[in-house]
Amino acid sequence: MQTAYHTYSSYQPLFHKNRRINDNLEQQAQALFKSWFVDFEPFLREEFFKSDSLFGDIPVEWHIVAIKDLSVYITDYVANGSFASLRENVRLYDKPNYAHFIRNTDLKAESYKMYVDKHSYEFLSKSVLEGGEIIISNVGDVGSVFLCPKLEKPMTLGNNIILLRPKKDYLTFYLYMLFKGGIGQHLIDGVTGGSAQRKFNKTDFKSIKLMMPPVNILIKFDRIIKPIFSKIEENRDEISRLTSLRDTLLPKLMSGELKINDINN
């Protein structure tokens, strides 16, 4: 037991270090986003106009656009069928199976321990995840925003969250950071209802109006910000690898199947 505890403890500093680095990188990305798209620091010499939206005065060549008019695929778990058909065709497992079933709680913990079998995965074809999508919680813990990780197994979207998959790559980080920030959260609050349980639906979400800079500015921003998120993804891969290794070793150490010398060798 003491050996198992020592092994568990030895991994914790590595987890915390990578998560601290990622938190710092996210803060850098948000600071850059705020500089460009909240304070408009690179564009202060341009002419502005009053947008009659939460975004206030914006540069003349920029636009306010409803999400439904953007090149973004938006879907959720229930898009795959009725509640009855979902109950009949989807089986969840807490042991490794064909594909990950990605939930809000998993994304928060960066630990993916719910699975579906191949039949379930194929039935949930409308909400298959490729990695890199924007995921937003729309029931209960409304407004939690994530970038979907890229895992080794196939992935499918869990319930109570929606996914956004921009058809133009340069939109991804812009939209992700917009919804992570104060204005984006306020926009989500504006379409959220419910007293016993807060929630919003896809239709109302698609009606949200966003500030859209010209394409050349979005592309330039994407080129600057992408290396930051590449590093974040590298650190997440390392966390995932360490988590998998820890979860494999600990049961064997506790049962006596594996000795600490076996690991060292």
Please name every model-derived segment:
Residues M1-W36, F43-S85, S207, M211, ...:
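Non-catalytic DNA-recognition/assembly elements of restriction-modification systems
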Residues D52, K68-R91, H100-G131:
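Sequence-specific dsDNA recognition surfaces
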Residues R103-N104, F123-G184, D189-T203:
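A short beta-sheet element
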Residues H119-E122, L151, L164-P166, M212-V215, ...:
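Short, contiguous acidic/charged loop-to-helix segments that flank catalytic cores in large enzymes
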Residues I188, N261-D262:
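Short, hydrophobic secondary-structure boundary micro-motifs
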